[in-house]
Amino acid sequence: MSTKIIKASAAEPDVFETSISQALVELETNSDLKAQLRELYITKAKEIELHNKKSIIIYVPMPKLKAFQKIQIRLVRELEKKFSGKHVVFIGDRKILPKPSHKTRVANKQKRPRSRTLTSVYDAILEDLVFPAEIVGKRIRIKLDGSQLIKVHLDKNQQTTIEHKVDTFQSVYKKLTGREVTFEFPEPYL
């Protein structure tokens, strides 16, 4: 497989996605990640710019997500070197099924699985974003005007490795879901 991107419905990848795919191919040919990268591919990639800093979101197919996460730390380091310091995040390519209403109930015979609900997908995106850190707690603050602020508590042990990326995580999550989120590293409770 010379290309590392397989899009849904056989659409052609754009120039940016092709460059990401090419970078993955180069990493596969000349690095110690060869064995792990051989079977892996991505479904799409986006570049977003927030606060004068660009970040790259790479979507991976759900069955391959665990394999990507095994090598994610090294892969992110190599890709960030290649793309001159832009932050790189890997996210599983998940689908959200619409909430069944009275009109649509006849159309789909199957019940909507929990993993395809909006809440579940948004929570999973958050977990993918902060990987390899672990979410140890979450608080949702609902203000009087109805807006929500999600406070995510991350593992204190990972603070040194991901603290510099927290702003990127916030902006990427806001862009993907439209939800405000803040990250904290609280002292562990004993």
Curated annotation (Swiss-Prot):
Keyword Cell membrane: no
PROSITE patterns listed in its UniProt record: RIBOSOMAL_S7E (PS00948)
Keyword field contains Cytoplasm: yes
Any Gene Ontology CC annotation: 90S preribosome
Subcellular location, record wording: Cytoplasm, Cytoskeleton, Microtubule organizing center, Centrosome; Cytoplasm; Nucleus, Nucleolus
Keywords (A to Z) from UniProt: Cytoplasm, Cytoskeleton, Nucleus, Ribonucleoprotein, Ribosomal protein
Molecular-function GO terms, alphabetical: structural constituent of ribosome
One GO process term, biological-process aspect: ribosomal small subunit biogenesis
Subunit structure: Component of the small ribosomal subunit. Part of the small subunit (SSU) processome, composed of more than 70 proteins and the RNA chaperone small nucleolar RNA (snoRNA) U3.
Record-stated family: Belongs to the eukaryotic ribosomal protein eS7 family.
Protein name: Small ribosomal subunit protein eS7
Species per Swiss-Prot/TrEMBL record: Spodoptera frugiperda
